[in-house]
């Protein structure tokens, strides 16, 4: 059943208001149909394919083991996991605000949170579905020469996978939140934030780098962390996991508030 037919059937049945789950599912379906027709999704897929080419090249050059795998992880956590969601999610909600179309999807008012959840699901779920197996494949390639080490390194793989999933969700929610606030130029705003905060501040030798998503993801994935001047800071990996996990619902709530107030804004 098409989206329009589903809405008409709901109206004919006399439904007063779609539930959060139903509305989010419809928003996600509509968003995915729009995304897969565009070029951005193919650009993101091509970017996520780069690490597999990279790991193959390094393996041919004689690099193996956990060192090779962590070299690949640097590519994921410094560039792909933060910046690909910026391409796919920054304008997901912002375009609805700019075009003022978020109020016309349903015959009856739908929960505003459903728009945010549906849009994020449509942009984040495909990225997770690509990154999780590609990381596992990179790990297998890195361990081929020393396959006996797989039993010792698979817990590291699990922590990397956890960090990747949490990172994609958090950065997708971050991109949507910033894009909602700066809906005229969402991608530019998100890229500026990522470069200033998630890249420069996260690598600075100061305790403030703990406020960045990037620092906690690296802590979860057992990647090198910047030295902290004047004081040593140690956070258990599960503490970073809880922090990264809390970011997504918090940013989704902020984005929902932004959507709720969008129809009353007069600056557009």
Name every feature range the model reports, one short phrase each.
Residues 2-45:
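Aromatic- and glycine-rich beta-strand/loop motifs that create alpha-glucan
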Residues 11, 15, 52-92, 116-185, ...:
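Secretory targeting signals
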Residues 28, 91-126:
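Helix-loop-helix units of permease transmembrane domains in multi-pass membrane transporters
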Residues 21, 25-36, 114, 155, ...:
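Membrane-interacting alpha-helical segments
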